[in-house]
Swiss-Prot record:
<dbReference type="Pfam" id="PF14527">
    <property type="entry name" value="LAGLIDADG_WhiA"/>
</dbReference>
<keyword id="KW-0132">Cell division</keyword>
<dbReference type="GO" id="GO:0051301">
    <property type="term" value="P:cell division"/>
</dbReference>
<dbReference type="InterPro" id="IPR023054">
    <property type="entry name" value="Sporulation_regulator_WhiA_C"/>
</dbReference>
<protein>
    <recommendedName>
        <fullName>Probable cell division protein WhiA</fullName>
    </recommendedName>
</protein>
<dbReference type="Pfam" id="PF02650">
    <property type="entry name" value="HTH_WhiA"/>
</dbReference>
<comment type="function">
    <text>Involved in cell division and chromosome segregation.</text>
</comment>
<dbReference type="InterPro" id="IPR018478">
    <property type="entry name" value="Sporu_reg_WhiA_N_dom"/>
</dbReference>
<dbReference type="InterPro" id="IPR039518">
    <property type="entry name" value="WhiA_LAGLIDADG_dom"/>
</dbReference>
<dbReference type="InterPro" id="IPR003802">
    <property type="entry name" value="Sporulation_regulator_WhiA"/>
</dbReference>
<dbReference type="InterPro" id="IPR027434">
    <property type="entry name" value="Homing_endonucl"/>
</dbReference>
<dbReference type="GO" id="GO:0043937">
    <property type="term" value="P:regulation of sporulation"/>
</dbReference>
<comment type="similarity">
    <text>Belongs to the WhiA family.</text>
</comment>
<dbReference type="GO" id="GO:0003677">
    <property type="term" value="F:DNA binding"/>
</dbReference>
<keyword id="KW-0238">DNA-binding</keyword>
<feature type="DNA-binding region" description="H-T-H motif">
    <location>
        <begin position="272"/>
        <end position="303"/>
    </location>
</feature>
<keyword id="KW-0131">Cell cycle</keyword>
Length: 303
């Protein structure tokens, strides 16, 4: 199950459901038609549970019994499209929800009352997400929530509504419509709280925190690996110089304190400077070890 489906199925099991939610669903996934000189309303979805939920919203609010139809886009079950079909009382529904324009079409913007009332706004956003929303799987680490609208003015109104709840919502226009979206993980979690998907919000946050912890561990491991590689690279240069001294004047020709450091460096090329300092018979500071190594390198360079 995708994360989007998980959110939507949590939403339809909430006890709340009102006309603002239904208005958003109809506006974003509904269409009007004319049959036998009367209007009919079709609301489409690819989720059977959402279709039954829309059916219940209409039946409970208007004592109208819709019909659920379906057809197959392909032979794959997941491409089955469900239509909640209403052929009675459509004018009443449109008038009550303030959805009809003067040309018997659907109004493209959002009612001012929805934009000004917090509770109405929450319900509308819930319906909008159920109808045309999606969230990129948080496991991907690339966060995005978007709601598709047929009309740009609706997408812009939707962004305005989301901005009212302090979300950094933006819109982008496509050939076939417009998208309202947010891309910050914190905004997506806040949106889930606004529409009531608390369980999915907690799941999203847990996945986000786990990814961040993994990334921190990987960064630490990469830094440690880089430091080890740097240490070995530096120590190999010194080891080559020590071998040069051994092959020419002999290690025993060096002062005893340089011999001890040289022997440890050859024996443990992976040791950090601090580890070399700690391993000496009479431990010294890191700067003391560095000073002795520089002396060894200088002697080798002069040979």
């Amino acid at each position: 199950m995708s994360f989007t489906t998980k959110v939507k199925e949590e939403l339809i099991h909430l006890s709340t459901g009102d006309n603002n939610e239904l208005a958003a669903i109809i506006k974003l996934s509904g269409s009007l038609g004319l049959a036998h000189q009367s209007l009919h309303l079709s609301i489409t979805t690819e989720n059977a549970k959402i279709a039954r939920y829309i059916y219940s919203l209409i039946e409970d609010a208007y004592v109208i019994v819709p019909e659920i139809r379906y057809h197959q886009k392909t032979n794959l079950r997941k491409n089955r499209v469900y239509t909640v079909y209403v052929e009675q009382g459509v004018e009443t529904i449109l008038a009550d929800l303030k959805l009809a324009d003067s040309f018997f079409g659907l109004e493209t913007g959002i009612e001012p009352q929805v934009l000004s009332d917090d509770n109405a706004g929450r319900s509308y956003l819930k319906g909008a997400f159920l109808a045309a929303g999606s969230i990129r799987d948080p496991e991907s680490g690339k966060y995005q929530l978007e709601i598709y609208s047929v009309y740009l003015d609706h997408a812009q109104d939707l962004a305005q509504l989301m901005q009212k709840f302090m979300l950094d919502a933006k819109t982008i226009e496509h050939k076939s419509g417009a998208v309202t979206y947010v891309q910050k993980a914190e905004d997506i979690m806040d949106f889930l709280i606004i529409i009531g998907a608390m369980s999915c919000k907690e799941d999203f946050e847990a996945i986000k925190l786990l990814r961040e912890a993994r990334n921190d561990i990987n960064r630490a491991n990469n830094a440690e690996t880089a430091n080890i590689a740097k240490t070995i690279s530096a120590s190999m240069k010194t080891i080559n110089n020590i071998i040069k001294i051994m092959d020419t004047i002999g290690l025993e020709s060096l002062p005893i304190e340089l011999q001890q450091v040289a022997q440890l460096r050859v024996k443990h090329p992976d040791y950090s400077i601090q580890q070399v300092a700690d391993a000496l018979e009479f431990p010294i500071t890191k700067s003391g070890v560095n000073h002795r190594l520089r002396k060894i390198n200088k002697i080798a360079d002069d040979l």
